[in-house]
């Protein structure tokens, strides 16, 4: 049988070529249009940021005083034996230099708040990406603030949430990182942060919740205290023990994941039964009249 050959009519071939060309042109137009919109969006965003920076930067507060950090401390009246008999002031705080803060307390805070604190320049771009991915499909957002950003916010800015305040926060963060060392920033954070029960800073919180100096806290106690910055009332081990316990266990796991503690230490910390202090009185001797007399003499 002789071979058969197929042929395409010239009109149909021309029509197919025209259709293909039209499709390609349509796709090119769509790509160019999308690219133009994205480019315009990026340019507009850069212009908005530039204007915001021009407005915000000259109005940034002077942070030179933080190089010699001296927070407000309560008036404490001690006996001749050094026993506390009276404390006056709205804020409980014990200023503790960074070198005197135990490593276990620092590790617990870094594990839950900012594990890359000593690596980033104030803003953790990895943290932003992780938070954005974690927030997809979640009703409740997950934050990405570094410790430096929290210092900038807690010391100088209001709690109001808007884009302008966020710009101020980021600018202040870079300014803090430029002027202060990492240890200085961490020292301010560890002493300044509110932790509930009128306690500011982890030294005061250790006394308020466990009735012991900060240098004596265990891994389990440090993990419990490290959960307080997120929400001091919600994770208060006195008023909300179940929620506090849940976060404490998570922090212990984070400490292990980041290499701060061994698996054996983590297991032991999870099993430790904490003795939480009930009551807000830190005085060992009740001599209120004497303490009040001293206060009046001091402010006379």
Model-predicted regions and their roles:
Residues 1-78, 116, 136:
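N-terminal type II signal-anchor transmembrane helix
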Residues 55-108:
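Terminal hydrophobic membrane-targeting helix
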């Amino acid at each position: 049988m002789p071979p058969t050959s197929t042929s395409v009519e010239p009109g149909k071939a021309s029509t197919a070529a025209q259709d293909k060309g039209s499709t390609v042109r349509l796709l090119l137009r769509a790509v160019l249009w999308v690219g133009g919109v994205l480019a315009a969006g990026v340019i507009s965003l850069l212009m908005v940021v530039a204007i915001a920076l021009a407005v915000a930067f000259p109005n940034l507060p002077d942070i030179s005083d933080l190089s010699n950090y001296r927070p407000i401390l309560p008036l404490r009246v001690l006996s001749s034996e050094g026993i506390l008999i009276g404390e006056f002031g709205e804020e409980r705080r014990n200023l503790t230099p960074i070198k005197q803060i135990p490593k276990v307390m620092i590790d617990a805070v870094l594990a839950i708040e900012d594990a890359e604190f000593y690596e980033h320049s104030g803003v953790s771009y990895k943290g932003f990406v992780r938070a954005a991915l974690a927030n997809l499909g979640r009703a409740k957002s997950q934050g990405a603030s570094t410790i430096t950003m929290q210092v900038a916010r807690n010391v100088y800015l209001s709690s109001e949430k808007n884009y302008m305040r966020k710009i101020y926060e980021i600018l202040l963060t870079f300014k803090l990182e430029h002027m202060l060392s990492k240890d200085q920033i961490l020292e301010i954070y560890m002493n300044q942060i509110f932790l509930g029960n009128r306690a500011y800073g982890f030294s005061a919180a250790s006394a308020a919740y466990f009735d012991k100096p900060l240098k004596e806290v265990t891994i389990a106690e440090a993990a419990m205290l490290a959960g307080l910055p997120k929400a001091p009332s919600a994770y208060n081990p006195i008023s909300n023990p179940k929620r506090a316990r849940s976060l404490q266990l998570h922090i212990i796991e984070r400490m292990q994941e980041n290499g701060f503690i061994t698996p054996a230490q983590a297991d032991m910390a999870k099993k430790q039964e904490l003795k939480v202090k009930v009551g807000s009185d830190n005085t060992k001797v009740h001599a209120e009249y004497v303490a009040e007399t001293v206060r009046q003499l001091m402010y006379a």
